[in-house]
Amino acid sequence: MVAQLYHHLTILIASIYIIFFVNAAPTLYEDDEEDFNSTEYDVFLDSDSFQFPRRNSSCNCTREEATRTLLEALKRALQIIAGYINETDTEELPTYPPTMTTPLETTPLDTSPPVLPSAIP
C-alpha cells in the first residue's frame, strides 16, 4: 500500500513537472540560426500566460486557467491517493516465531583467578 502511494506521488510530481516545465518551455529547433527572441519565447517569459497544454500549440492560457487545471488535477490525484489510504486491509498481520521460553544452556563463567604456569608443580 505504501509502495502504491509512493508510485502515485511520483506520477503526480512527474505530471506537474511536465505540465509546467516541459510544455511551457520554448521549442528549440536544431537550426543554429533560430531567433531566440521569437514570440514563442516571449510568450514563455510573459508572467500572465504560458503555453498549455502542448508545446507547439498556438493557444495560450492565463495563469488562472492553468492554476484551475492544476488544482483539478491535484484534486483528482488526491482522491485517488485517499482511496488507497482509506481502503481497509483484510490481510492478517504476519506471525512471527514465538519467543524462546527456555533459556539456552550455557556453561557458567569461570571467575577464579588465573593460574600462572610457574605455580603448576
From Swiss-Prot:
Its main location: host cell. The chain crosses the membrane at residues 9-29. Residues 98-113 have a biased composition (Low complexity). Keywords: Host membrane, Membrane, Transmembrane, Transmembrane helix. Residues 91-121 are annotated as: Disordered. It is a single-pass membrane protein. It comes from the Viruses. This is Uncharacterized gene A4 protein. It comes from Alcelaphine herpesvirus 1 (strain C500). The lineage of its organism: Viruses, Duplodnaviria, Heunggongvirae, Peploviricota, Herviviricetes.
